[in-house]
């Protein structure tokens, strides 16, 4: 399939530049794959579309302030920006490094007690870097000096509001460089409300550059997704099997949860996944899916289209129709935007 088939027009003013408060006041579009019906609601009322005993699965990863600003050691006016993409092992990270003449061996001074050493080049502006922190571990140093890597399409720098709202309320395991945005809509109050009706569980997927890497090929079959680390526990697998046995629904909150579950399927899994979901993919775990409104021609929009494919429903056409409906009703798009529940 040609990537142009996943394009759509979006007015600039519908790109959400800031989060809504409270989180659960975001709009919710509900799509029914069987009837092709579209219903408008809010996240606070999402329980009205769920059944007693359904299982909602979230991603408990935590966003690191992965944007580090520094300068070449010993050289004035030599600003360098590092965006940590993926933790590899110990002090070693995969990172985008922006600046002039970035070469292996370069030492980047982030602070008097925190440095990055460029070890080798992977491709273009992507490098392997070693983080060296004095009198603290590297995560403490990243949290101390780093900035939240808010998406570039917000067109602004990080602000205090982002520290709270570009993080889920249940974030626990650090190492993501972007938020699992479908979960940003869930406040503590909404979670307490939901627990009275449905079951809640968690996977871990540490979001890396692979999740939001642009599709640069014309034929979507040729796109490759970078590896990301996931954890799917034995207790979650048991919970999923129990839910299925009761004829209730397993609902993934976000594309990261979707990819983790469809990688593990019916066994515990601790490792990496490069699963790329596109039209024709056969879902083995999911019965429902909560997600945001994604960028045109993105792998995430391709994934959502794949989930909407039914025997008598073209998933791509249905999703693009729903996006047109969202524009008409002034839904807010992308990371800080509104969301949809697909059943």
Swiss-Prot record:
Its EC number is 2.4.99.17. GO terms for biological process: queuosine biosynthetic process; tRNA wobble guanine modification. GO terms for cellular component: cytoplasm. InterPro entries: QueA, QueA_dom1, QueA_dom2, QueA_sf. Pathway: tRNA modification; tRNA-queuosine biosynthesis. Keywords: Cytoplasm, Queuosine biosynthesis, S-adenosyl-L-methionine, Transferase. It is an enzyme of class 2 (transferase). The keyword Cytoplasm applies. It is found in: Cytoplasm. Its main location: cytoplasm. It catalyses: 7-aminomethyl-7-carbaguanosine(34) in tRNA + S-adenosyl-L-methionine = epoxyqueuosine(34) in tRNA + adenine + L-methionine + 2 H(+). GO terms for molecular function: S-adenosylmethionine:tRNA ribosyltransferase-isomerase activity. Pfam families: Queuosine_synth. Monomer. Transfers and isomerizes the ribose moiety from AdoMet to the 7-aminomethyl group of 7-deazaguanine (preQ1-tRNA) to give epoxyqueuosine (oQ-tRNA). Belongs to the QueA family. PANTHER family: S-ADENOSYLMETHIONINE:TRNA RIBOSYLTRANSFERASE-ISOMERASE (PTHR30307:SF0). This is S-adenosylmethionine:tRNA ribosyltransferase-isomerase. It comes from Hydrogenobaculum sp. (strain Y04AAS1). The gene is queA.
